[in-house]
């Protein structure tokens, strides 16, 4: 026996046998692969070019159909996803708006709280605190402001009261409409035109009460006239001042004359009505036109000779002018 068989032991496999088995399996695999390759080559040799071309066309058609089906499926998915995406974006926007509003309200509440704290701090720790009476004057306003800040802030209404800033200092005295005293206006008022003393329409009574003022006016007019006739005084003043004084004298004289004439006319009408209504139970009052005629008659009777002649000349000229206008050569 050879050396190889002598060294074999029962129930034990040597390492050389394992190696040989592996080599044999590898050789078998290679043989099978070679056989398959030879068979495929033989089959390709038997195929014609026309059949190969048809097979290529079939493969291309299948690929195109598969691509189209995939593109359609993707398009439908996109169309389905678009409205969902829009809905999601709208929801996100709404949520963002709600969060912003909540944050804005929280900030406003925080600002109001800080302002109220500052107000209380300024009132309690100010350098110059107002007196107790002044503080009581504003108790109601401070309570109202605290209640308003405690509630949730709503939108400003049309007829809401005006809001003043907390940075401005509060005045010790509040301005009340109707009780404002304007310093520009004079405090002293004329009693004649005060409603508390009676109706201002009753001019006759006012004239009777203050008739003594005419004497003072006459004295002032006489003094100004004497000053204007004084040469020494005129040499000291300018021409402008002289003209102003002359205008003032004329103005005062015209006012005094108008007041005196009105008083005289009222007296004439009153006396005439008293004579008419002596024996009448029902009093008769004259019209304005009748009053004018009565006044003119009285004035004409109490005029001097020269004044009457002047009045008659004026009336004669008026009458002639009216008659002259009525001629035919004026009616063209």
Swiss-Prot record:
Biased composition (Acidic residues): 124-144
Region annotation Disordered: where it falls in the sequence: 1-184, 305-332
Pfam families xref list: RRP36
Keywords noted in UniProt: Coiled coil, Nucleus, Ribonucleoprotein, Ribosome biogenesis, rRNA processing
GO terms under biological process: maturation of SSU-rRNA from tricistronic rRNA transcript (SSU-rRNA, 5.8S rRNA, LSU-rRNA)
UniProt entry tagged with the keyword rRNA processing: yes
Location of this chain's protein in the cell: Nucleus, Nucleolus
CC terms in the record's Gene Ontology section: 90S preribosome; nucleolus
InterPro entries: RRP36
Comp. bias intervals (Basic and acidic residues): 73-100, 321-332
Coiled-coil annotated spans: 236-283
Main subcellular location of this protein, as a coarse class: nucleus
Keyword Nucleus assigned: yes
Amino acid composition bias (Basic residues), ranges on this chain: 150-159
Function: Component of the 90S pre-ribosome involved in the maturation of rRNAs. Required for early cleavages of the pre-RNAs in the 40S ribosomal subunit maturation pathway.
Family: Belongs to the RRP36 family.
PANTHER family xref list: RIBOSOMAL RNA PROCESSING PROTEIN 36 HOMOLOG (PTHR21738:SF0)
Assembly notes: Associates with 90S and pre-40S pre-ribosomal particles.
UniProt-recorded name of the protein: rRNA biogenesis protein RRP36
